[in-house]
């Protein structure tokens, strides 16, 4: 029997149900590493938020804990995108790479920094995320986490952004040369209110 390269369209709902037997039936005719065709990201099974039981089943089936989607993002990148940081420690425990880089050369910590929640950044660093990482993308150029924090230069997020900046700097993150320009722009926005 020839195995499918793609996952059933309702795979995310099946995983959400937490029913390991239903998932086993749904993927029995799928290759290891099969992807979701309807997604621009070409998500693999490990990319969907899942219970420990589902995660264990998928790993026992042979799925890769560090599988890559179309943009080279890993399941840990995916958990950041889905705002399911609570599942990251288990992925790390099972071999997930918290410092894996995607096609933009960014680690999952860049995604957490983008949401500007210092408590989440602190968790990621405690779990092993490197705050000193510098992404070097052909599309976006070089980016430090401190620079990425201020890239939108929004006064509305200034308090949260500055909390994240302070946290990153306290953990040895390099300073981006664009920070002073971003801070001046945020201050200019503040003065116009």
Regions found by a protein language model. Give the residues of each.
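Ankyrin repeat domain, specifically the short helix-to-loop turn at the C-terminus of the second helix
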Residues: 25-32, 56-64, 89-97, 122-130, ...
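Ankyrin-repeat boundary/"N-cap" motif
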Residues: 4-11, 35-47, 68-75, 101-108, ...
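A generic tandem-repeat structural signature
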Residues: 64, 68-117
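Ankyrin-repeat-protein effector appendages
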Residues: 1-13, 127, 147-193
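N-terminal segments that cap or nucleate solenoid repeat domains
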Residues: 1-48, 53-57
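Ankyrin repeat A-helix N-terminal signature
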Residues: 13-18, 44-52, 78-84, 111-117, ...
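Ankyrin-repeat and related helical/solenoid repeat scaffolds used for protein-protein interactions
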Residues: 104-163, 167
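Conserved ankyrin/ankyrin-like repeat signature
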Residues: 22, 53-54, 86-87, 119-120, ...
């Amino acid at each position: 029997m020839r195995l499918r390269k793609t996952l059933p369209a309702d795979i995310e709902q099946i995983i959400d149900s937490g029913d390991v037997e239903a998932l086993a039936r749904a993927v029995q005719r799928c290759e290891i590493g099969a992807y979701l065709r309807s997604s621009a990201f070409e998500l693999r099974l490990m990319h969907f938020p899942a219970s420990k039981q589902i995660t264990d089943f998928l790993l026992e089936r042979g799925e890769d804990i560090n599988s890559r989607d179309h943009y080279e993002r890993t399941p840990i990148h995916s958990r950041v995108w889905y705002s399911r940081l609570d599942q990251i420690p288990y992925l790390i425990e099972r071999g997930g790479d918290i410092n894996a880089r995607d096609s933009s050369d960014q680690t999952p910590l860049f995604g957490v920094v983008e949401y500007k929640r210092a408590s989440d950044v602190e968790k990621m660093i405690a779990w092993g995320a490197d705050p000193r990482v510098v992404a070097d993308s052909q599309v976006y150029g070089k980016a430090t986490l401190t620079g990425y924090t201020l890239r939108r230069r929004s006064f509305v997020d200034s308090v949260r952004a500055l909390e994240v900046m302070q946290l990153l700097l306290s953990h040895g993150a390099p300073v981006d040369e664009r920070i002073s320009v971003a801070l001046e722009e945020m201050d200019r926005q503040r003065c116009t209110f």
